[in-house]
């Protein structure tokens, strides 16, 4: 399944989550596209709930089905809770860390920064969005990209940086100083549904 590249607001309204990070797309019309007003939806089956939860998280991080499933399988080989490990692995993706540092306003924009070679890891350019960032690694904006307008605009509006990352706005460098705890990740996601979905 290819990565969705259409309007994010449509997916946000269909799944009931904000993919832009602002929540604005849900303020005016907090119901699915195609509905003529906030009419009551049909009752969803257990399978439907599980699938919807999977789609929420997949679109949140902007992954293809194959990338999502591969990461899920990788999480299953780690010690601890499968669902929590899965969410932590998603959070360790380079494009996500770039987003968390405030260098991009959305994960989609962060993915483009990585793809276009604007980001380095420990001084070496990395253009793979799925690269898994380890604790202690230094993420930086390339010197040639320091005046990138998209980065500058994002830094102007970004204020919240999670406690598990550190960022130096003057040097445009940051790092993952520890793995996140479950309580610091998306509260609107029930990862148990996703584990159940793939266990069918």
Swiss-Prot record:
<comment type="similarity">
    <text>Belongs to the universal ribosomal protein uS4 family.</text>
</comment>
<dbReference type="GO" id="GO:0003735">
    <property type="term" value="F:structural constituent of ribosome"/>
</dbReference>
<dbReference type="GO" id="GO:0019843">
    <property type="term" value="F:rRNA binding"/>
</dbReference>
<comment type="subunit">
    <text>Part of the 30S ribosomal subunit. Contacts protein S5. The interaction surface between S4 and S5 is involved in control of translational fidelity.</text>
</comment>
<comment type="function">
    <text>With S5 and S12 plays an important role in translational accuracy.</text>
</comment>
<dbReference type="InterPro" id="IPR022801">
    <property type="entry name" value="Ribosomal_uS4"/>
</dbReference>
<protein>
    <recommendedName>
        <fullName>Small ribosomal subunit protein uS4</fullName>
    </recommendedName>
</protein>
<feature type="region of interest" description="Disordered">
    <location>
        <begin position="22"/>
        <end position="43"/>
    </location>
</feature>
<dbReference type="InterPro" id="IPR018079">
    <property type="entry name" value="Ribosomal_uS4_CS"/>
</dbReference>
<keyword id="KW-0694">RNA-binding</keyword>
<dbReference type="InterPro" id="IPR036986">
    <property type="entry name" value="S4_RNA-bd_sf"/>
</dbReference>
<dbReference type="GO" id="GO:0042274">
    <property type="term" value="P:ribosomal small subunit biogenesis"/>
</dbReference>
<dbReference type="Pfam" id="PF01479">
    <property type="entry name" value="S4"/>
</dbReference>
<keyword id="KW-0687">Ribonucleoprotein</keyword>
<dbReference type="Pfam" id="PF00163">
    <property type="entry name" value="Ribosomal_S4"/>
</dbReference>
<dbReference type="InterPro" id="IPR001912">
    <property type="entry name" value="Ribosomal_uS4_N"/>
</dbReference>
<dbReference type="InterPro" id="IPR002942">
    <property type="entry name" value="S4_RNA-bd"/>
</dbReference>
<feature type="domain" description="S4 RNA-binding">
    <location>
        <begin position="92"/>
        <end position="170"/>
    </location>
</feature>
<dbReference type="GO" id="GO:0006412">
    <property type="term" value="P:translation"/>
</dbReference>
<keyword id="KW-0689">Ribosomal protein</keyword>
<dbReference type="GO" id="GO:0015935">
    <property type="term" value="C:small ribosomal subunit"/>
</dbReference>
<comment type="function">
    <text>One of the primary rRNA binding proteins, it binds directly to 16S rRNA where it nucleates assembly of the body of the 30S subunit.</text>
</comment>
<keyword id="KW-0699">rRNA-binding</keyword>
<dbReference type="InterPro" id="IPR005709">
    <property type="entry name" value="Ribosomal_uS4_bac-type"/>
</dbReference>
